[in-house]
């Protein structure tokens, strides 16, 4: 029995102990379970957590609350961001409604464009520091029509608006009929240049230039990159000083035509003088302003370049201008004398005239420019003024002339007194121009002996005494030129050029630098060589030094000086008593292409000789006798 029990126990133990196969299968089973756990770790963890939640219901509740808080926080942040965006958009829309450039857009702009336009608008408002705008000039109790009539009545003129691009008359008041005798319908839509004097067109075009007005800015859309079209209606604009305009011009006057016989016009000069009366001098005062083309009722161009461009116009009041005639003042009331400033070339030609001269002489500045002052001097005062002309070219001091007569536009003479001084270029040491301050002298000042204006010590020399005739020869009577009033001499403008040539010759012979006309046409047309004879037939001796005559042009006696070619009787002004029409005819008769080429060749030889670049100069090719 005991042996049977031992066998049964050993058999059971063998059966219960794992064999090699069992160990392999057991190991494979264990590894398979591990792999399943690795592949299904998340599900296992979830199951474990579910088991844990089942085991702990309080933890499950906390997890649910945490997930709800996260979801609520996300929803609250989205709502906050949405409200912030809505508020910003509302502010952007409100800002766009306040900015005129944005409000005028036909489509909605992006935020960046709105902000850019707002910044530009703020800069514009900051720059508008001048409180005097157009709206401030008009009282509140006056309407626009009442104010217009009051201004026209006070100014005694007419209001007109002219486009700066083509000079088209956009508007003119009815009062233009009282001044120009044109109706309102006759002028509106016409070109202003058709009614201007031909010599004043360039001046008016210069005044219509709108380069100094406010520049127009082109806005670019940030999304499309294309220029933004603006249809902004400008508010009250500032009257900046650069936009103001004040000028004189001559306009046609529509006077009734009267049939005149041909005998009433003996010459063409008198016809031109009669035609000159059809123009009247208008003083225009106003400013430049810009309007949208749609507001003016004009046709807009559909071109892209013209988009957003405003129309620049000249708004001005035209008044009939009449020159001031000085009246004698009775009593002890002293007022400031009327004067004007002019600038002349060294030959006496006008290169600048102050606008005050129009009120005194009735000439427009553009009428005097390019003409010689000797054309307006009385023939009895030319001798004294020519001597002053020579002195001011030779000295740096101010020269005060005696009282002289100056011809004004209507043919009469006005008494003036001038102070002349020459301006010398500090670098080239050359006289560039002469500045003249001309003061009107009243009749009572001449009669009363005002110490400010010293009396003439002697009667002024006439032109004939300054320019004596040939030795023992009788004086010729000069023919009168139709259209030129008496008191002046035809060809007197030649005197200034001859004086300039004489002074240039003096400086050149002395070896000093010539005057500023060395580079001007005066030096080309004249300047005889140093060994050439003077107009009187005298020659400069070799080695001789010219002497400046002390008496100048006023002396009537001949002074022999072999070393100076232009002294008194042999002066360039004293040799020919008839320098008027005779010298002009001689100069015109000797002008030809061949003569001009020969003259230029001689001049180039002179320049090379002065610079030491050439040999002796041959004067045999000159077309005129020396």
From Swiss-Prot:
It comes from the Eukaryota. A motif (Nuclear export signal 2) lies at residues 361-369. The keyword Transferase does not apply. Pfam families: HLH, PAS, PAS_11. Hair follicles (at protein level). Highly expressed in the adult brain, skeletal muscle and heart. Changing residue 78 to E: Phosphomimetic mutant which severely impairs DNA binding and CLOCK-BMAL1 transcriptional activity. SUPFAM superfamilies: HLH, helix-loop-helix DNA-binding domain, PYP-like sensor domain (PAS domain). The modification Phosphoserine is found at residues 17, 78, 90. A motif (Nuclear export signal 1) lies at residues 142-152. The modification N6-acetyllysine is found at residue 538. Coiled coil: none annotated. A motif (Nuclear localization signal) lies at residues 36-41. GO terms for cellular component: aryl hydrocarbon receptor complex; chromatin; chromatoid body; CLOCK-BMAL transcription complex; intracellular membrane-bounded organelle; nucleoplasm; nucleus; PML body. Residues 143-215, 326-396 form the PAS domain. Residues 1-60, 458-493, 511-595 are annotated as: Disordered. The record marks 125 as: Important for interaction with CLOCK. Residues 508-588 are annotated as: Interaction with CIART. Signal peptide: none annotated. Residues 401-444 form the PAC domain. PROSITE patterns: BHLH (PS50888), PAS (PS50112). GO terms for biological process: circadian regulation of gene expression; circadian rhythm; energy homeostasis; negative regulation of cold-induced thermogenesis; negative regulation of DNA-templated transcription; negative regulation of fat cell differentiation; negative regulation of nuclear receptor-mediated glucocorticoid signaling pathway; negative regulation of TOR signaling. Residues 72-125 form the bHLH domain. It is found in: Nucleus; Cytoplasm; Nucleus, PML body. Residues 484-493 have a biased composition (Gly residues). Transcriptional activator which forms a core component of the circadian clock. The circadian clock, an internal time-keeping system, regulates various physiological processes through the generation of approximately 24 hour circadian rhythms in gene expression, which are translated into rhythms in metabolism and behavior. It is derived from the Latin roots 'circa' (about) and 'diem' (day) and acts as an important regulator of a wide array of physiological functions including metabolism, sleep, body temperature, blood pressure, endocrine, immune, cardiovascular, and renal function. This is Basic helix-loop-helix ARNT-like protein 1.
């Amino acid at each position: 029995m005991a042996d049977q029990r031992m066998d049964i126990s050993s058999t059971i133990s063998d059966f219960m102990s794992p064999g090699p196969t069992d160990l392999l299968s057991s190991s494979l089973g264990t590894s398979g379970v591990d792999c399943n756990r690795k592949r299904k770790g998340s599900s296992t963890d979830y199951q474990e957590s579910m088991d844990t939640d089942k085991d702990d219901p309080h933890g499950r509740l906390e997890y649910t609350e945490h997930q709800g808080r996260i979801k609520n926080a996300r929803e609250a942040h989205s709502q906050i961001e949405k409200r912030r965006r809505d508020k910003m958009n509302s502010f952007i829309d409100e800002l766009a409604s306040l900015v005129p450039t944005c409000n005028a857009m036909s489509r909605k702009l992006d935020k960046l464009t709105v902000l850019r336009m707002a910044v530009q608008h703020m800069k514009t408002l900051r720059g508008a520091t001048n409180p005097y705008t157009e709206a401030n000039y008009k009282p509140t109790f006056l309407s626009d029509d009442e104010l217009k009539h009051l201004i026209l009545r006070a100014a005694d003129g007419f209001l007109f608006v002219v486009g700066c691009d083509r000079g088209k008359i956009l508007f003119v008041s009815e009062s233009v009929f009282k001044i120009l005798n044109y109706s309102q319908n006759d002028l509106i839509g016409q070109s202003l240049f058709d009614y201007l004097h031909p010599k004043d067109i360039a001046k008016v075009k210069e005044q219509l230039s709108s380069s100094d007005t406010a520049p127009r800015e082109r806005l670019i859309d940030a999304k499309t990159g294309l220029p933004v079209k603006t249809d902004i209606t400008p508010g009250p604009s500032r009257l900046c000083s650069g936009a103001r305009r004040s000028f004189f011009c001559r306009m046609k006057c529509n006077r009734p035509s009267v049939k005149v016989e041909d005998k009433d016009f003996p010459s063409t000069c008198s016809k031109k003088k009669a035609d000159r009366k059809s123009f009247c001098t208008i003083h225009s005062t106003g400013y430049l302003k810009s309007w949208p083309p749609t507001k003016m009722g004009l046709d807009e161009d559909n071109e892209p370049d013209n988009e957003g461009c405003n129309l620049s116009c000249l708004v001005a009041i035209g008044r009939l201008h009449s020159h001031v005639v000085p009246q004698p003042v009775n009593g002890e009331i002293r007022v400031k004398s009327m004067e004007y400033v002019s600038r002349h070339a060294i030959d006496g030609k006008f290169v600048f005239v102050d606008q005050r001269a129009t009120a005194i002489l009735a000439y427009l500045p553009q009428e005097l420019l390019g003409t010689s002052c000797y054309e307006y001097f009385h023939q009895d005062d030319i001798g004294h003024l020519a001597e002053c002309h020579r002195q001011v070219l030779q000295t740096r001091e101010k020269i005060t002339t005696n009282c002289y007569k100056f011809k004004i536009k209507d043919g009469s003479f006005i008494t003036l007194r001038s102070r002349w001084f020459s301006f010398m270029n500090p670098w080239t040491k050359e006289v560039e121009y002469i500045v003249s301050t001309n003061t009107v002298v009243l009749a009572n000042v001449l009669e009363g002996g005002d110490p400010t204006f010293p009396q003439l010590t002697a009667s002024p020399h006439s032109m004939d005494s300054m320019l004596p005739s040939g030795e023992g020869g009788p004086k010729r009577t000069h023919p009168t030129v139709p259209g030129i009033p008496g008191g002046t001499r035809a060809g007197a403008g030649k005197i200034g050029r001859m004086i300039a040539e004489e002074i240039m010759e003096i400086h050149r012979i002395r070896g000093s630098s010539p005057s500023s006309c060395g580079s001007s046409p005066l030096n080309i047309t004249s300047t005889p060589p140093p060994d050439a004879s003077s107009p009187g037939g005298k020659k400069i001796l070799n080695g001789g030094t010219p002497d400046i005559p002390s008496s100048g042009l006023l002396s009537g006696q001949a002074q022999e000086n072999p070393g100076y070619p232009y002294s008194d009787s042999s002066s360039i002004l004293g040799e020919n008593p008839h320098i008027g029409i005779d010298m002009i005819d001689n100069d015109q008769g000797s002008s030809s292409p061949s003569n001009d080429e020969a003259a230029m060749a001689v001049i180039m030889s002179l320049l090379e000789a002065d610079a030491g670049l050439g040999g002796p100069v041959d004067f045999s090719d000159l077309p005129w006798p020396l």
